[in-house]
């Protein structure tokens, strides 16, 4: 725990000495969770289904929980110095909103707010419902849980890049052969903690406040320059494109006042852009802030699309618009840019902005979707925001809770526009379980059948462009749950698990009548699927025996040439390793079929990085398995450039010669 965190907790403890609070929100408990999280970061282990999208986000959630506690007992919170004059309310009064608890809206129309008063009513309704249901402490310190994956996935992708694409500049490359970030959707760039252009490595240091630029044109690596961020700016990841670096993360403005009585609160997502034309002297050329904690982003056709979670923790006042309306730049979002929730209340927004790479000092467009907690999947043309209603305090029956709500926004050259909303039964494991193809949306969900019971099954749904269900298969793999999925053209594959690993193949050629083609049962389960060719599907997961006891990380190759008769043609178990970052972040995988290279980090008694190759006769062959130096919670990445392979963790970089993988250099930043 940092001195700054201790200082904040001390102030909270002083403020709460005479005020009873839930045990889970007690300062001592928050301190305990922080220390436990530090230990978790050191081990590198994130439990399945309950991981956080970033280590520093969990810490942010804990501090946010502490801040919520202060607000709850009446601490004085100063808002940003914004004039409500910038908000122009409609002359209409507040809309009439239904107040019957437990019912999700049946409307299939994605509606925008008519005025800020309407937005206020939805937010206040949530708080009223929260108060009346007496569940103020039910979220265990107010930490927001995220899906275990930290980016997205689904269409066939390659990790390698033989030429510059939307998120990688190649102008300086002495060899155009270098790897790129493993992405969810081909053609849609994603940020990461390490990038290369073939000549330089760009890496986020362990403190999340510096980016080092390392010359890799010779065997001996050399730091040529770096970027030091504002001390209150915690970077999460960045993009590299056309000699510009786009850094994304959270700007923290929390501090204890000198009078020891006032706690200042403020946090926003920041997009800061640097010009790399002079590689020895990067220059800041633009900054855009938006309300909320950074969630994720995408890059396509010269535009960044940035997503943040904006939670309404504080007491709000109807006419004090800056207290509850999101900001992008210095401007409050217009009412027409705020999409209303599907039920009668909400406690947060998912804020979406677009920023042009050529004008990085301002937002091109912005929207906000009111919700209770949503995840994001981005296809080539649309953004899908999905949230599982089971967590809702507003749904009091299983039918209302056990469904996923979907909202659809189109995007094109920076322009954002809401287009549809819908719902399906059950919940999505991650964004690999949702895929857009040929104007349809395919989903694989797990459905709970009884309140308080483990009884569940799995379903396949096909939705049209308006998010209306046009095809489905239900009651699959009873008492199991989806662990991974992948789609290729008219065929989908998904893995469920209880003690064995059934790999289902689904025919979507007739969207109104999807059909199960085959089911292969093998021990263990695959957490991540990646197409290795048109006929081969790679799986990375865990090896288990018939009793469900894990034996280590397993890699499998499936022959999918006949989707009705899928076969596991090769497998390799890496025993003594209980986890891989790939399970929660697909960007940790480097899969390049052209180079016959499969690389990913391992966690066990020691942290290692493994590279395997695949041959149809010999199966998997380990080409390299080396211990990883560095202990950054940001994770480990492997990249290649100019026939050299680099393993990066925090401030440590190790270089290997590809082919024999002999170590040729290392560098401590």
What do these predicted ranges mean?
Residues 9-11, 19-38, 78-669:
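Beta-sheet-rich non-transmembrane sensory/scaffold domains
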Residues 1-6, 10, 35-99:
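Membrane-interface helical sensory segment of bacterial ECF anti-sigma factor regulators
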